[in-house]
Design a protein with these regions (language model features):
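Beta-strand-turn-beta hairpins that frame and shape the catalytic cleft
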Residues: 1-5, 17-23, 102-111, 160-167, ...
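Pre-active-site segment of Zn-dependent metallo-hydrolases
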Residues: 15-67, 119-147, 173-190, 290
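Active-site neighborhood of phospho(di)ester-bond hydrolases with catalytic His/Asp-centered motifs
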Residues: 24-28, 46-54, 74-77, 167-173, ...
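Active-site environment of divalent metal-dependent phosphoester hydrolases
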Residues: 31-32, 55-60, 80-83, 101-103, ...
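Active-site-proximal loop/helix segments of hydrolase catalytic cores
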Residues: 35, 142-214
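Active-site HxH/HxHxD metal-binding segment of metal-dependent hydrolases
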Residues: 38-123
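Binuclear metal-ion centers of metallo-dependent hydrolases, dominated by the metallo-beta-lactamase
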Residues: 72, 84-102, 210-292
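Short, surface-exposed amphipathic charged segments that create phosphate/polyanion-binding patches used
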Residues: 106-115, 127-128, 268-279
């Protein structure tokens, strides 16, 4: 059997491929904040799309990829409602999973949980952008308020692969808002073989704290907002500090920091690179439904 893999496409866009099926988390490809890593052709194999929350760099490209590939989109009630009524995706291609629910689709068992996002005040962001004359930040705030379900709940996923491996997408949950009790409850509820999670800002201690409780066998960290934070005048600690913190939290785990274009074999932890597909190199899949 072909080994299961995780690929990282930049931002919070990741894929998990197992047993011939591919699920994408928060696929996002458009040029944004100076980054232009991949294109829609690179998401052509999508069978499923899982939305973690409604901020624009997690959401804006989901409708177009879903239309092109006929992937089934999984998200909270707020996210699927927005996709149905504001973006015109048919109801039969939307699968609503709210917090602490579960289902199965061909290739994956899927369970959900809630996590807490660092504080974001959209009104304050607009005001600050106006005062500073930061048109990029202003465009982000306006787009977030009008083109995506900004206040959709923050939702993580745990996938169970056909061989029993569990993959948790913790997204941006490594932060000071998550309490020790909440993390412990996740660890009691789920066995975590692989955790996918963001590394950003000064949340180094929170990476160690979370990994120490979850005790995964593999930790795959990615930088969800480096380019965005640079646009906002913020920066994050070096990647090496996050990986060291994760390793300290789970000394026996395989820890990998993902740059865009990184692929990890979930069987043995080997790391390789994949390249952006040239425009037109690969046609998008024919319109055949993959809904369960």
């Amino acid at each position: 059997m072909t080994p299961a893999t995780v690929r990282y496409f930049g931002w919070s866009a990741l894929s998990v491929t197992a047993a011939g099926r591919t699920l994408y988390f928060d696929p996002f490809y458009r040029p944004y904040c100076g980054a232009d890593w991949f294109s829609i052709e690179d998401f052509a194999d999508a069978d499923y799309i899982a939305v973690t929350h409604g901020h624009e760099e997690h959401f804006l490209d989901v409708p177009e990829i879903a239309r092109r590939t006929r992937a089934q989109v999984i998200g909270s009630s707020a996210a699927t409602r927005f996709l149905r009524w504001r973006r015109g995706l048919p109801a039969e291609r939307l699968l609503t999973l709210d917090r602490d629910q579960s289902t199965s689709v061909p290739g994956f068992g899927i369970a959900t949980f809630g996590w807490k996002h660092r504080d974001i005040n959209l009104v304050r962001s607009v005001t600050k952008a106006l005062l500073r004359g930061n048109t990029t930040q202003l465009a982000w705030a306006w787009s977030s308020a009008t083109r995506a379900p900004f206040y959709a709940p923050y939702k993580g996923y745990v996938l169970t692969l056909p061989d029993g491996t569990t993959v948790m997408n913790y997204n941006e949950g490594f932060n000071t808002k998550m309490t020790d009790r909440e993390i412990s409850e996740l660890a009691q509820r789920f066995r975590v073989d692989v955790v996918l999670a963001g590394m950003q800002l000064d949340f180094v201690a929170d990476v160690r704290r979370g990994v120490a409780v979850l005790q995964p066998k593999m930790v795959l960290l990615y930088p969800p907002h480096e380019k965005f934070h640079a646009m906002m005048g913020a920066s994050s600690r070096p990647w090496s500090e996050f990986t060291a913190a994760a390793q300290a939290g789970a000394p026996h785990a395989r820890v990998v920091a993902l740059a865009p274009g990184t692929q990890v074999n979930l069987d043995d932890g080997t790391v390789s690179r994949f390249e952006r597909r040239p425009p037109g190199q690969r046609a998008l899949r024919k319109e055949t439904s993959v809904a369960a």
